[in-house]
């Protein structure tokens, strides 16, 4: 029995029953979200006084909070169930080591690419800007908790209830791993509890299916407020930084992640099309966390092992943030160039090493990349911290691409680790990416079981 069948019931199959009728185009989630984003942009551009109303902003914030509401129970149920179904405890450790090794190698590439592009393009050179420390002081304060020792200690929750209440991914993940191992050691005595957790996972994904119906509303509110508050004219000379970041992130996905996909045996563009719903939701909310539950489910349908999905995806949301990594090195060089500060190669190497640590403190929440940037600058060269105000006004426009790159990177990482573990179902992979299985059937599988 497949991992998906164990979690969500029988999967619709063309061999077992006639294929379901295709949904009308106006009921397709990704089209609804896309239309909502366009309408949000128009409202923010044409009527910024309406778009910046707190109730419009609440539409986007409310949707993200609804998603975050169920992330902790989803991670707990998925990880515990995945580990409890494994008979060999050594396998969990093996998967974890492979995932972390992958994260470090790919994250290093992302950081290095941002550093190289920043030196070649020199987009901040000659700007002659000055920074405003007050504008970014709250981010610097939050960044104080991002140093390596505090980061490690913060993984350990003061209480299990507190970890769930705060929705801290790494704390919930730590408890879930320990609980899963404990359940696995119980043997047959733990089967009933394991089945209860499997059923709970099914129910929580049902909640997600309900919440996702509000995705277009959330995307509309978030995009309208963003455009209304900052507006196209607010970009000014910083449009160059945004363009360079967009192009760099796109090239990273196509070339680096594309090469990894080729090694595994699939096409990166087909993969992007497969997760288009999740990408559009992330685009509207600028938070990769908003698509975490759906991404995990789609990866299982893609043929990835349930145990690998349960371990790699939640961990990747803190340890494998490719878009954030590119942003940190590129933005650091931009700020230094804008302030007229010449960084030596030794200092730039320090940026690379420090960012490898500070980036691990970033979560999938919108704006977390700005906090990790503050952490990096405060360690490398405190004189650069006030310069964060230069990119503050346009950070929101880069946040979306950071989140899109992050979620794509985590998806590819999960497929790669499953392939590395010889637990990737290539038949499912080919069927899903070649549309033999319609991704829209996921909602049916969740809601009907």
UniProtKB/Swiss-Prot annotation:
Protein name per UniProt: C4-dicarboxylate transport protein
Membrane topology: Multi-pass membrane protein
Function: Responsible for the transport of dicarboxylates such as succinate, fumarate, and malate from the periplasm across the membrane.
The keyword tRNA processing is annotated on this UniProt entry: no
Signal peptide: none
Keywords: Cell inner membrane, Cell membrane, Membrane, Symport, Transmembrane, Transmembrane helix, Transport
Compositional bias (Low complexity): 10-20
Family note: Belongs to the dicarboxylate/amino acid:cation symporter (DAACS) (TC 2.A.23) family.
GO cellular component annotations of the record: plasma membrane
Subcellular location: Cell inner membrane
Region (Disordered): 1-20
HAMAP family registered for this protein in UniProt: C4_dicarb_transport (MF_01300)
Single GO BP term: L-aspartate transmembrane transport
Annotated PROSITE patterns: NA_DICARBOXYL_SYMP_2
Organism: Rhodopseudomonas palustris (strain BisB18)
Gene Ontology molecular function: fumarate transmembrane transporter activity; malate:proton symporter activity; succinate transmembrane transporter activity
